[in-house]
């Protein structure tokens, strides 16, 4: 036996057969395998052992001699004369530091792992780190026994959820319950992804409401009223931002609106009157300048809806202008010449380009941006109405159209509120996540998720 052990120590990587025939080969192989066995049990073995003795937690397990069990002197080590077993040097919270170092098997109703805290009430005795027997109450058993950090420090940071919007009156359509997108300065950080499905579900409800055959047309349109934005520009009230007011007694915004000289800080776009058999047209979007324009020599008429911008009474002949990276806005706007629109236009999402005369028309249809005379401004002119008569009529209250319009309006001003919404149904102070900005190479294959 001693010769076998000596030969094994000389060549530890080989299982040598004993040359002496007086010793059995089986004993020699057993000794050699014991020398190479693992000293500590694996987690699977510990779990199996915990399940086996779960019904009798006070059973005694005699470990073999080749497995080292940490002793009490190993738990209270000192470094430079200081005791490091106290809570001061422990990287774990206080309620778990008292039980570090020893494995405790607690009897419970369902016990799947020795390191997890049992779900049911338990009465057991285990040794603490100081080697003293401690009775555990059911309240103390719920604390994690294994020396792991608190679960709250392992997960992501919890964000407070914004307050829920009040429920609308039953008589109002579901399209008026969408939350507004207001990225205020200082609070413009994106919310956690747990709040993202809410705006998509609201957009989907908005889409379904506006695509209904019997949907009320005023549910998808709103009147825009300018007011100064002190949150963005401080005390300077000359930079207007747009608030979608929502009184129930507003005049019909589907008729052409005359803009006087005093109301030129923001352009209110309203749809023109449509024939009786025409399908419900789209949103009346809003485009506002970044600085107050000079008063025009004569009142302007803003057209949107089914009216072709090139056929408006104020439109005059002009040269064709190249499209400035595509505008998702679906309104033909009469703007003063001091405001240049092209540099703010963003690339359309899903490669869908919406124009005043289209209801989510085919992206292959050409869009011509004309630059009008010196007294007028650039307008977005789409294909004529007869060219779109053969296309399937869709409502512009579409998820992609709404998101593309919001994305383009984000380049104009920091305060964005979605159209198709009346502020009466919104309440005050509710904020949701803003539509993210896209780079130039990201506009081709992006689709917003729709929850059905």
From Swiss-Prot:
Annotated coiled-coil segments of the chain: none
InterPro entries xrefs: FAM222
Superkingdom in the source lineage: Eukaryota
PANTHER family hit by this protein: PROTEIN FAM222A, PROTEIN FAM222A-RELATED
Similarity remark: Belongs to the FAM222 family.
Protein name (database record): Protein FAM222A
């Amino acid at each position: 036996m001693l010769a076998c052990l000596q030969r094994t120590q000389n060549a530890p990587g080989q299982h040598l057969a004993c040359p002496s025939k007086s010793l059995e080969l089986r004993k020699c192989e057993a000794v050699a395998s014991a020398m190479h066995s693992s000293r500590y049990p694996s987690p699977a073995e510990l779990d199996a052992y915990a399940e086996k003795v779960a019904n009798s937690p006070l059973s005694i397990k005699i470990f073999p001699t080749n497995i080292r069990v940490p002793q009490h002197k190993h738990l209270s080590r000192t470094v430079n004369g200081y005791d490091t077993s106290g809570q001061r040097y422990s990287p774990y919270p206080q309620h778990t530091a008292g039980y570090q170092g020893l494995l405790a098997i607690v009897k419970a109703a369902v016990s799947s792992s020795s390191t997890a805290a049992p779900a049911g009430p338990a009465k057991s005795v285990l040794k603490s780190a100081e080697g003293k027997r401690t009775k555990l109450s059911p309240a103390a058993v719920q604390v994690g026994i294994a020396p792991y950090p608190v679960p709250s420090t392992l997960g992501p940071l919890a964000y407070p959820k914004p307050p829920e919007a009040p429920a609308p009156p039953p008589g109002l359509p579901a399209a008026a319950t969408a939350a507004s997108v207001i990225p205020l300065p200082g609070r413009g950080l994106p919310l956690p992804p747990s709040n993202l499905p809410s705006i998509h579900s609201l957009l989907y409800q908005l889409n379904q409401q506006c695509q209904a055959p019997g949907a009320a047309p005023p549910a998808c349109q709103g009147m825009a009223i300018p007011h100064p934005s002190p949150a963005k520009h401080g005390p300077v009230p000359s930079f207007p931002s747009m608030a979608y007011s929502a009184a129930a007694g507003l005049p019909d915004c589907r008729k052409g609106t005359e803009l006087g000289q005093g109301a030129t800080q923001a352009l209110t776009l309203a749809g023109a009157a449509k024939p009786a058999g025409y399908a419900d047209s789209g949103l009346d979007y809003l485009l506002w300048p970044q600085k107050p324009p000079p008063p025009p020599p004569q009142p302007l008429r803003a057209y949107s809806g089914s009216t072709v911008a090139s056929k408006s009474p104020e439109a005059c002949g002009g040269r064709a202008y190249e499209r400035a990276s595509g505008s998702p806005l679906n309104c033909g706007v009469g703007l003063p010449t001091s405001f240049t629109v092209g540099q703010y236009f963003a690339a359309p999402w899903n490669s869908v380009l919406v124009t005043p005369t289209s209801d989510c028309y085919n992206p292959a249809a050409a869009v011509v941006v004309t630059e009008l005379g010196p007294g007028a401004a650039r307008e977005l002119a789409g294909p004529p109405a007869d060219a779109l008569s053969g296309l399937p009529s869709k409502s512009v209250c579409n998820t992609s159209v709404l998101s593309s319009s919001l994305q383009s309006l984000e380049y104009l001003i920091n305060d964005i509120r979605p159209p198709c919404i009346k502020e009466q149904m919104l309440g005050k102070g509710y904020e949701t996540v803003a539509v993210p900005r896209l780079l130039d190479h990201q506009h081709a294959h992006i689709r917003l998720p729709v929850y059905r």
